[in-house]
Amino acid sequence: DEINRATPKTQSALLEAMQEHTVTVGNDSHKLEEPFFVLATQNPIENEGTYPLPEAQLDRFMFKILVEFPSKEELKGIVMLTEGANAPVIEKKMDGEGLLAARALVNQIPIADAVMDYLLDIVMETHVDNTYIKEGASPRAAQALIRGAKAKAFLDGRFNVSSKSYLF
């Protein structure tokens, strides 16, 4: 929670975990069990007591989702769901093995050359001279875009990547 409040030393340790799937304590390295992935929040409002996230760390996140403040009706729904006797009980829907199996299925979803080229063109366009883009998308970003399109196809019950897979 609020990853930008982590000290640079903690961020460095998290970067090691994200890149190498290991953590080091003293001189001992420990392999992290699969599936391992990081979900993080960032407080976009308050900057006091925060540390900037290094580009190398930001590049390892597949997506950044900006969550807007909910409407009054949405806020009411949130409050009604989370406060009082009707608060939902969180149920386990899948274990680690199931998640790894789903990941393997997603990886097998084919992507046509034309679709691949279109998605790579999007990434390449971030590298043209543009005053609005500070740094272009990395090769990891291209991989994440392809992986995200495959995952969307999988979640939609489709067995190939189409324009419906990347028009989020």
Annotate each predicted stretch with a short phrase.
Residues 82-168:
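Basic, amphipathic alpha-helical bundle interface domains used for macromolecular binding and assembly
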Residues 10, 18-109, 150-153:
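Canonical AAA+ ATPase core
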Residues 1-2, 13:
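Walker B catalytic acidic pair
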Residues 3, 29-30, 165:
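Proline- and acidic/polar-enriched loop/turn elements at helix boundaries
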Residues 2-6, 21:
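Conserved Walker B
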